[in-house]
Amino acid sequence: TTQEQIRKVTDIAQEKGWSISVEDENKTSIQFEFQRYTKYGQDFNFNADMQDEDIDTLIAGMKRYYEDFDPDYEAYLWIGDDGHGRNGAPYHIKDIVSDMEETEEKIYELLQALEVEFI
């Protein structure tokens, strides 16, 4: 059932170090928000949707997010006008990039765990 799938996704995400919230009031589109703090303490999150109670749509959405994830661009978003980290990001650009590269790996690990469980 859909509730069992939501529970499994939640359990797997938590095992991988992610916090998760699920917005399932609309049964045709259930939104999952995955959140974690990076090694350098940045609050990182992303969303993916499950359409029509089909777990494959959630995994496909997460896969698209992972494939489109650009650590350099994500790091750029955290660089202030002075060329250093802002809003809680590390001071040095190289550390911001490293943090986002590690975040990309964490997204991949979560995606892989869900694929093993559901595909």
Language model features with spans:
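Intrinsically disordered, low-complexity regulatory segments enriched in Ser/Thr/Pro
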Residues: T38-E102
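Negatively charged, low-complexity tracts enriched in Asp/Glu with abundant Ser/Thr
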Residues: T1-N45, V116
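Short amphipathic alpha-helical segments
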Residues: T1-Q5, D99-K106
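Generic structural signal of hydrophobic/aromatic residues within well-ordered alpha-helices
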Residues: V9, L58, M62, I107-L110
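Acidic, proline/glycine-rich low-complexity IDRs
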Residues: E101-I119
